[in-house]
Structures are given as structure tokens and as C-alpha cells.
From Swiss-Prot:
Heme b b562 binds at residues 83, 182. Heme 1 (or BL or b562) is low-potential and absorbs at about 562 nm, and heme 2 (or BH or b566) is high-potential and absorbs at about 566 nm. This is Cytochrome b. It comes from Crossarchus alexandri (Alexander's cusimanse). One of its GO terms (molecular function) is metal ion binding.
Amino acid sequence: MTNIRKRHPLIKIVNESFIDLPTPPNISDWWNFGSLLGVCLVLQILTGLFLAMHYTSDTMTAFSSVTHICRDVNYGWIIRYIHANGASMFFICLFMHVGRGMYYGSYLFMETWNIGILLLFTVMATAFMGYVLPWGQMSFWGATVITNLLSAIPYIGTSLVEWIWGGFSVDKATLTRFFAFHFILPFIISALAVVHLLFLHGTGSNNPSGISSDSDKIPFHPYYTIMEILGLLTMLAMLMILVVFSPDLLGDPDNYTPANPLNTPPHIKPEWYFLFAYAILRSIPNKLGGVLALILSIMILAITPLLHTSNQRSMTFRPLSQCLFWLLVADLLTLTWIGGQPVEHPFIIIGQLASILYFSIILIFMPISGTIENQLLKW
């Protein structure tokens, strides 16, 4: 008689996805981040659900309802800080996951990669709307500045911004709809994540060598479940250290001041995980040009499969491409730092140079290095 996990219609799906899944024998810790993202998503949905029970999406009471959650609700403070810092962990795992995909050539699984880009955009939209909800100074002004970027679209820009705002400025209507979208989007993300997994399990996982491992696969459990649990415990430990010891480390002090439309903060900036894109936006003096560069900074991921010129899939044995990859990582860290600095000399020129380098590495240098490496292999 077959085991229940192999014959029950529902348990069978779980079994084929997480237990008996044929997995390459040589995947490293870099393959952990997919499951960590799943855990982050569940954590965010659960903590968000409890926060939504006490939060009110009204401009008059939003700020005080967050204060009420932290002061009066049982363990409200820890739920709120797990949710806020959980978003940061989510993005750390996201960036690592995308970086892993770029390094090991996982972008050649086109369907999985494109769903991943869609997921990235959806998560970014969700995080942005969540940042607006506490209705502090930076929430309000961040929402005003970022949504106002759409006014750069010719002809329909101004009408589009007013339509999103639900009026002539960021106000009650904006906050209410942002809360509604922030609540529903994580469930859409969950559905997209299932599609992402579906496409991945259609092709099987990539591995560090970039060579097919079909003849040599091993079951996911117990070999990789142990590794996943270690990664999970490490991430949860880091998250809880952050939550308990310095919960406001990654936040903005201005958000402890209630939103005031009459008083602009000296330096408006989004959360840290958007700073690299914000720096690219600010590095172009023209408004429409800046918005296009902002969108392209993420959309450029969609054309990476077309820019793959190497005969090898992975960067494991490609030293030139490795140097460029780590230069790209350093460049992104520089952009993140610049995004948090005021718009003045020397930060303006550093931001512009870093933005040019970002696009140059992906569009020009990476394809050239792949071609050079192909030639070197012939020697």
C-alpha cells in the first residue's frame, strides 16, 4: 500500500513540491532565500492581519491608532516592529535571491524569471503603500513625492495623479485606498509565488555549476530541509535581534511626527530598500527622464536573458564576469548610500556616476565580458 503522502490528492502536491522533489546535489546556501521569502510573506500577512484589527485608515486617527497599537494592545509593539522590520528582511532576502539568479544564470529559466520580476514590482508597490499608512511626516511626504512622479507622463500625468490621490492632494481618500491595496496585495503576491514555484518545478532548480544535473538528483527531504531550517533560524534570529534591540534602526525619525501638509521635512526619502532606485531617479535633472530611469533600473532585469553571451550559464568559472558582478553590488550599495544623502555637492556627481555605471555594467560590460571569456576558452 502506497504512503498517504503519495496518494492523497492534496498531500501529493505538497510531497512533490517539498519532500520528494528531485534536487541538484550541489546547491548551496544561496538557494535558501526562496523559502525564506515564503516565510517572510507568511510572517508579514499574519502580523499585518493583527495590525489591521486595530488600525484605522483615517487621516485624523491613523497616527494615534498606531500609537494605540504600540502602547495599549497586548504585545502590539512587537507585532508592529516585526511587521516593519520584517519588510526589511523581506527585501534583504529579495535582493539576495535576485543576485543569486544573476550570478548563477537562473534568468535563463525565462518564465520563472519574468514572474519573479512581476513579484518584485508587486512587493515594492505593497511596501511603498505600507510605508504611507502610519501617517507620519515621512509617510505623507514620501507618498506625495513618489505619486507626484506620475505627473511627468505627457498629457495624462496630472489627471492620473489626481485619480490616484482621489482629490487634489494626498488626503483621506488616498490613505483609505492605500490601506485597501496594502491589505489585498500580499494575497496576490502569494498567488504569484505559487505560479513562480510551478514554473520552477517544471524545469527543476539550477545549480552552482550551471550544468544539467538531471542524472544525479537527490530528494529534497531530508538533505535540504535541514539546510532550510538552519537558514530560517538564522534569519529569525537576526530579525528578532533587530526588533528587540534596535527596532527603529531602519526607520525614519520623522515618522514619529504626525503628518503635516504645511511643514515639509528638510530631506524627503523613502525606506532604505528603495534608496538605490531613488538615487537613480534624482541623478537625472529632467523629471520624465528620471521616472523612466527609475522604472528601467528594475525593468532592466527583464532583458538580462537577452544579454547573456557566454557559452557557460553560471559565473562560477568566469572571473571577468565575477569582477563585474561584485562591482555591480558595490555600485548598488553606493547608490543606496547616495539616495539617503541631501542633494548637494559631491553627492550629486557621485550619484550620476554610479547611475551611469549601473546601466553600463548590465547593458555593455557584462555581454562584452561573456564574449571575451568565450574567446579565452578557445586558446
